[in-house]
Structures are given as structure tokens and as C-alpha cells.
Amino acid sequence: MKIVILGTAYPYRGGLATFNERLARQFQAEGHDVEVVTFTLQYPSFLFPGKTQYSNEVAPTDLRIKRWVNSCNPFNWVSVGRKIRKMQPDMLITCYWMAFFAPCYGIIERIVKGNGKTRCLALVHNMIPHEPSLLDKLFAPFYVKSTDGFVALSDSVVKDIDKLDKCRKPKTFSPHPIYDHYGERMSKAEACELLKLDADKDYMLFFGLVRAYKGLDLLLDAMGKMHDKLPNLRLLIAGEFYEQEEGYREQIKNLGLTEKVIIRNEFIPD
């Protein structure tokens, strides 16, 4: 089968890029012909709160990745749709996670399906984002109408799709897989030595981008209530802050956790 995956990938960084690249490799391992189409412009800078959108790792040599899509340029969407239509893929998989991309994906899908061959499958991480906006109601239905079927990575996302899918298109729930590309496990002692942590302490990990909806403030409150009972416990916050770090540091200070919380405010690569 000839498959085109449309979504974020190298040179962009993050979990979604990792997911799409791992998916492409799995399809290749199963004998399919796979190409990944990603962005020349993913987010305008004013929509991206982090330090950089780009990976500093070496480009993958085992994947065919084309940087074609400008998420903000409708003329580009038409051009990309025509290019993919000419490729005559059996399946176009659009990797969807927020309504900002719905017009772009929806236009491209409609054009690609003009070849009378390609089926469009939505691989949905979030139908309604963790931080909803008016865009969800305006744009998401347009995308849903252009898609032939859905794979959702959580049961709640299936329910969100049902609210928008008036045609009752095929959809299935496939739990988000566990990543298997991080290498061999190591002992706690080895890990603590590499990370320059005290191996005699117990660690609780908050890992990933720090955003308000993820509840770090609640975790800190909980730790403030239990740290006297668990004097050996330390909290390691490892990830880039998409919120103001100062507010969390003030909370840590007020809760008396300054010596018990370790912050690594940086993006953690694969």
C-alpha cells in the first residue's frame, strides 16, 4: 500500500513528530511505501510559547520527509493537495491535534480525494484541545466532513468526534502505544549518576512541557501536604515551561519545598 502521512515531523521536535516518524517506520517495516509530508511553517511565532519549534538532532536517513505545507497559506494548501493527488496514494493519514490545522487539512483532503483513489484517515490525538477555543467549533467540523474515517488514541476522543461527525463515519479507538525507541533500561544508580542526582533519594517525575492544564500546581500542593511524611521524596520537574516559571517557583517557596523540588526547564530530546 502507498501511504502518505501528513503531520509534524523532522525538523520539528516533540512527541507528535516522534509519533509520526515511528508510525512511518512501522508501516515501512510491514512492507508499505511511505512518505511523510510536513510543514515549512507549522505555527506562527505568536502561537508558539516555547523556545524553538525545531529539533537539534540529526535528520533521519531512513524516512522520506517532504517539507511542503505552510499552515497559514491557503494557496499553498491547494498546491500541496494537488501534489499529493498526483502521487496517487492509497491512503492519506492526517495527524490531527488542534483546530488551527483543520482548514489546512480539510482543503488538502478534499483536493486529494479528487483522484478517485485515495482514502483519507484521521489519526486524532485530540479532537477538542486541552485548552479549547472558538476555533474548535468553527473549524473542526470542516475537517471532520472531509475525512473518510477516524482512529482515536483515547476513548474520550472517540466521544468528542461523535459530537462533530453527523454522518457517523467509521471510527475506532486504538490506545496510544508505548514508545519503544528509547534504548535499553538502566539502573537507578546509573541514571542518577548521569543526571547528577542523589541515588539515596526517592524521586517523583513530572515530565514534559509544563502547561496550566497539566496540573503541576496541584501536584505541588499535594507534595506540600505529604512531604513531612515522606522526607526522602524529591520531585523532579523535567520539561520546558510554556507558562511563567516564576509562579511555580513562588508556590514551591511558599510550600516549603525549595530543597525538595528540582527543576530542569528545558526541552528533553529523545
Segments the model singles out, each with a brief description of its role:
Residues 116-121, 127-146, 159, 186-189:
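Nucleotide-sugar donor phosphate/pyrophosphate-binding loop at the beta->alpha transition
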Residues 39-43, 207, 234-247, 266:
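Glycosyltransferase donor-sugar binding loop
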Residues 9-13, 25-86, 157, 162, ...:
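N-terminal strand-loop element at the rim of the active site
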Residues 183-197, 250:
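A short helix/loop element that forms part of the nucleotide-sugar donor recognition site in Leloir-type
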Residues 198-214, 220-223, 236:
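Conserved donor-binding/catalytic core segment of Leloir-type glycosyltransferases
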Residues 7-22, 44, 97-102, 214:
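A short, glycine/small-residue-rich beta-strand->loop->alpha-helix junction that serves as a flexible
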Residues 145-186:
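Donor nucleotide-sugar binding/catalytic pocket of nucleotide-sugar-dependent glycosyltransferases
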Residues 246-267:
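Nucleotide-activated donor-binding/catalytic signature segment of Leloir-type glycosyltransferases, i.e.
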